[in-house]
Amino acid sequence: MTYFMLFLGLCFVLGGLAVASNPSPYYGVVGLVLASVVGCGWLLSLGVSFVSLVLFMVYLGGMLVVFVYSVSLAADPFPEAWGDWRVVGYGVSFIVVLAAGAVVGGLAGCWDLGVITVDSVGMFSVRLDFSGVAMFYSCGVGMFLVAGWGLLLTLFVVLELVRGLSCGAIRAV
C-alpha cells in the first residue's frame, strides 16, 4: 500500500508538472486530467470517497471549461511540444524546487507526522467524510444554488465570448 501511495504521489507531481510547464493549452489539459484523476485516486485510497468524488466533479467540470475556452482562443498553427528546450527548462526548475522543498522539509523534521485516514479515529458509526454530507445539503443549499447559477452564467459568458462575430473558434485573436 505504501508503494501504491508513493506511485500516486509521483503521478500527481508529474501531472502538476505537466500543467505548470505546459507549452500550449492542448497539452495542459492532459496534465490537468492526469493530476485530478490521480489526486482523487489518492484521496480514495485514504478512504475519503465523498470528497474525492466532489473534487473530481469540480475539477473535470469547471476547469475543463476554462481549458476549452483557452484552447479555442489559442489558435496556434504550430504549438510547442513538451520536448522544446524552454519547456524542459520549466520542468527541470520545477523538479529542483520540489527537491529543495523536500530537503528543507526533511531537515525541519516535517516528515514525522504520518498519515491518518478517516477510519482510524475510533469506533464511529458514521465515517468522517460522510458526516458532512448532510450539512452540505441542508445548511449549504443556498451557496450550492448560487454556485450552480454562477457556473451556468459562466458557461453562457464563455460560449458568447468564443462565438465572437459568428466565426466560432476559428477566428484569430
From Swiss-Prot:
GO terms for molecular function: NADH dehydrogenase (ubiquinone) activity. InterPro entries: ComplexI_Subunit6, NADH_UbQ/plastoQ_OxRdtase_su6, Nuo/plastoQ_OxRdtase_6_NuoJ. Keywords: Electron transport, Membrane, Mitochondrion, NAD, Respiratory chain, Translocase, Transmembrane, Transmembrane helix, Transport, Ubiquinone. It catalyses: a ubiquinone + NADH + 5 H(+)(in) = a ubiquinol + NAD(+) + 4 H(+)(out). It is a multi-pass membrane protein. It is found in: Mitochondrion membrane. Its main location: mitochondrion. Coiled coil: none annotated. Its EC number is 7.1.1.2. One of its GO terms (cellular component) is mitochondrial membrane. The chain crosses the membrane at residues 1-21, 27-47, 48-68, 87-107, 139-159. Core subunit of the mitochondrial membrane respiratory chain NADH dehydrogenase (Complex I) that is believed to belong to the minimal assembly required for catalysis. Complex I functions in the transfer of electrons from NADH to the respiratory chain. The immediate electron acceptor for the enzyme is believed to be ubiquinone. Belongs to the complex I subunit 6 family. This is NADH-ubiquinone oxidoreductase chain 6. It comes from Synthliboramphus wumizusume. The lineage of its organism: Eukaryota, Metazoa, Chordata, Craniata, Vertebrata.
